[in-house]
Amino acid sequence: MITWQWLSFEQLTNQQLYQVLELRESVFVVEQNCPYQDADGKDPEAWHLLGSTRQQQLLCYARVFEPSPLTASIGRVVIAASARGDGLGQQLMQQAIDFCQQRWPQAQIAISAQRYLEDFYQKLGFEICSEPYLEDDIPHIGMQFSATA
């Protein structure tokens, strides 16, 4: 069973922050062989979604930014390698979408999706809104989820 927590940067404990940075680095830097700095200075402005086991092991994570001006964004979506294949990514994204819709019901939601996950995000209701582009030498595409008014 996964325990979901929404925390501001200030609410993250040292242990939680360490687990978040460790998970993001293990996937975005090591696994994806992407030698770019993950800590981008934006975490203090974000809401942080942590999905953990009862033993406080972090299995998945995403961060959300408030609308600016009319579009919220979800990013740094990550699932631990050991936790993939059981629908956790869909649960994580649904938690993030629900959070955005509850807090900012009129806002659209943007993501910068890695191209190989395009179908995954489309099944969640995201639509392509940009041409493909490279971000840190990884193919991405802009996608958007429209607000339900």
Located regions from the model:
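Conserved beta-strand in the GNAT
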Residues: 50, 57-65, 70-78
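A conserved beta-turn-beta hairpin within the catalytic core of GNAT-like acetyltransferases
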Residues: 66-75, 84, 105-107, 137-139
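Conserved GNAT acetyl-CoA-binding A-motif
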Residues: 93, 100-113
